[in-house]
Amino acid sequence: GLHLHENLALSFSLAQDFLEMRETGRKCVLDASLNGMGRVPGNLCMELIMDYMNKNYEKKYDINQVLDAIQEHILPIRQQESWGYSTEYFLSAKHNLHRNYAEYLQKKGTLTSRDMNQILKMIPEKKKAAFDAETAEKLYRKYENRKVDDGGVLSQLAEEFGGRRAVVLAPGKSLEEGWKKVRSYIRKEGAIPVSANFYFDEQEGGYAFFSNARRYEEYKTSRKQRSNVILTSNVSGEYGFGDLVINYDRLAYGEKSYSANCGILLLRLLGLLGVKEVALAGFDGYEEGKENYLAGYFGEVYGACAGDNRQIARWLTEIREQMKLTFLTPSRYEEEMR
């Protein structure tokens, strides 16, 4: 018998080869599922192989009943939990790895496919067959902690930010809803606005801060001319002229804990620059079943959950020991901090 996965988008082709090479007259089992349903990246599509066997092996499978079953029972499930070919699982197959490695890195939500390819190439031969979370995490952090000489950049930013207030703009829906209030605060206080992992069209001056390679790549095309960008060193690719790069590990490893959350990294950077008061806008937090981001935001988080609110609130509480934090828009993090 034969059971196939769709890692390399070859299951239908391999099934045809299997049928041709089997011994004539010998019974065999060819495993398939409706619409290729199966844990990502999915399996051989039953409707495809049935149709192929009807045409080439004189079978009489009723495809219409299969299509009806897919329409009624399978497609609603696929809308909630998708499957099928993806670049991440192609990379797992390419490097002959357990597919959980790709899933683990994908859930980080910070890596481009190019980044994932580089990390997966580093997995030792003896660790390939069985997934090892500790190995994956070590390689992920090693890759993210690429070093740059950021002393001059920190001095430049400290000169600009020192003694001033900053406003951190996160992509929650409340940012748009409360923008008049936020803009009024920025103008009144002479604060420097800094967006976190996105560009906000209404923002005037200030900076865009990116610690997520995927977000940076996705927003490259919408970058405004002469916009000021701060990147952490884990963000690969071509930097724009004048972009400022800060060592990732300088921000990810706080005094008490590790965090890859962009808003937290940005606040830690502002602390290093001598900023004593920061206002937060668009820090909505996560709520199950709700639209948690601005319309058109590219960065919806894979695997986000309400438990993240508590963790981020703990990080914010740590940061509040060093600087004053003011929420300009409603936030579930603020509720958790009370």
Can you describe what each PLM-predicted range is?
Residues 1-151:
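Catalytic cores and adjacent flexible loops of soluble metabolic enzymes
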Residues 148-338:
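Metal-ion/cofactor- or nucleotide/acyl-coenzyme-handling active-site neighborhoods
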